[in-house]
């Protein structure tokens, strides 16, 4: 069994906001949200999202127009009983020196949000295996040392 110090020494520390270098889009400030349930969300302009067969066409950050394979569809309760049906697509991206492939994202309108990517608790736990320092931003590239 790991002791308390071993548990923390083995974890990567990330800031509340990290730059995700997303294939086809570029670097996007992304919020790591441990309160967000099961799905990562990437901004898609709501007026641009189209479904053509098994392909999702949409405009996203920096006016990039993308065509992605639809892998799923989810229904999200956005609050106040409002349900939003979203297409799910996969992206490859890099955070610091770690690369991730074929990670699912729902496409949602985040035009009123400061951060155009919202990272889910499940991704943080299952893939990043990191601790989030909410007082920090963009530290994924830094070597952080902890002393006890």
Per-range role (PLM):
Residues 1-11:
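Charge-dense, intrinsically disordered terminal/linker segments
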Residues 9-148:
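Pepsin/retropepsin-fold aspartyl endopeptidases
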């Amino acid at each position: 069994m790991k002791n308390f110090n071993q548990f923390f020494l083995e974890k990567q520390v990330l800031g509340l906001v990290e730059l995700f270098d997303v294939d086809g889009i570029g670097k996007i400030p992304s919020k790591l949200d441990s309160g967000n349930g099961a799905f990562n969300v990437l901004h898609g302009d709501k007026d641009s999202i189209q479904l053509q067969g098994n392909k999702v066409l949409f405009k996203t950050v920096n006016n990039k127009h993308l065509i992605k394979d639809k892998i799923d569809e989810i229904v999200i309760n956005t609050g106040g009983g409002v349900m939003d049906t979203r297409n799910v697509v996969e992206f490859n991206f890099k955070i610091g020196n770690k690369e991730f492939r074929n990670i699912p994202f729902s496409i949602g309108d985040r035009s009123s949000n400061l951060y155009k990517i919202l990272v889910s608790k499940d991704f943080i736990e299952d893939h990043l295996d990191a601790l989030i320092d909410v007082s920090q931003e963009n530290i994924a590239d830094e070597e952080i040392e902890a002393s006890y």
